[in-house]
Amino acid sequence: MPSQGKKYEYLEHTADIKFLAYGETVEEVFENAALAMFNVIIDTEKVSGETEREVLLTSPDLESLLVDWLSELLYLFEVDEVVFWKFQVEEIREEEGEYSIKALASGEKYYPESHPFETEIKAVTYNQLELEKTAGGWKAQVVVDI
């Protein structure tokens, strides 16, 4: 992994939050991007529940699938009030020109007293979005609107 063991890191950005996520596989980079995003919202080390949500999505390309994946998790947080800390992407596959993801997100009910709110994310953006296979695995760059 080119990140020297890191799952993700935050980068400088003028108005929003930008991060790089790393993984040995495309599935792992999607998991680590989700972890990076949720650590913007809350401290995921304070989450331990096993409430699961299954995520099944289809998109025209891998970059769109990454944005859709993160956007769906953000939607589940906002609507179901579940904070996630563990992500298991079971499969990402390409079929007939479309990409699909099958994944589980684990967490617990959001309680402000248990999960101090760090930063509100309004949306996952396509701004400066990158997803690429590298010599040591995969790397994704994501900007979220705050």
UniProtKB/Swiss-Prot annotation:
The record lists its disulfide bonds as none
Name the UniProt key words of this record, in alphabetical order.
Calcium, Metal-binding, tRNA processing
Q: Which SUPFAM superfamilies match?
A: MTH1598-like
Q: Which BP terms in the Gene Ontology apply to this protein?
A: tRNA splicing, via endonucleolytic cleavage and ligation
Q: Which domain of life is it from?
A: Archaea
Amino acids binding Ca(2+)? D16, D145, I146
Query: What function does the entry list?
Result: Activates the tRNA-splicing ligase complex by facilitating the enzymatic turnover of catalytic subunit RtcB. Acts by promoting the guanylylation of RtcB, a key intermediate step in tRNA ligation. Can also alter the NTP specificity of RtcB such that ATP, dGTP or ITP is used efficiently.
Report the protein name in the record.
Protein archease
* Organism of provenance: Methanosarcina mazei (strain ATCC BAA-159 / DSM 3647 / Goe1 / Go1 / JCM 11833 / OCM 88) (Methanosarcina frisia)
Q: What is the lineage of its organism?
A: Archaea, Methanobacteriati, Methanobacteriota, Stenosarchaea group, Methanomicrobia
